[in-house]
Amino acid sequence: MPAVSRLGDMSTGHGCFPPTDMVLTPITKTFFNNIRAGVMDSGCQFTTHSCGIVVHPQEERFVSSGASKTYIEGKQAARIGDDIGDGDAIAEGSANSFIE
């Protein structure tokens, strides 16, 4: 089972686009290791990244897939391996909290 992703966890990067961190989450009451949880939502965003002159802006870099059975504050939980809207994926998560 993959680990739950949280605010500050990193993406994998893709092609020549570097990894970046999760900088926004709409979650306000659910924490893993004292860090707010990530979820599948356009408000759960990763930092802008670029490759040469091509830029993937933050508002296009949101978690676009999540757990099918685990919900956090009504939204699908984000985990290591889940997709980010621009072709990237979540690379980091909690060291001790795992879900389907």
Where are these regions (language model features)?
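Intrinsically disordered, low-complexity proline/glycine-rich segments
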Residues: P2-E100
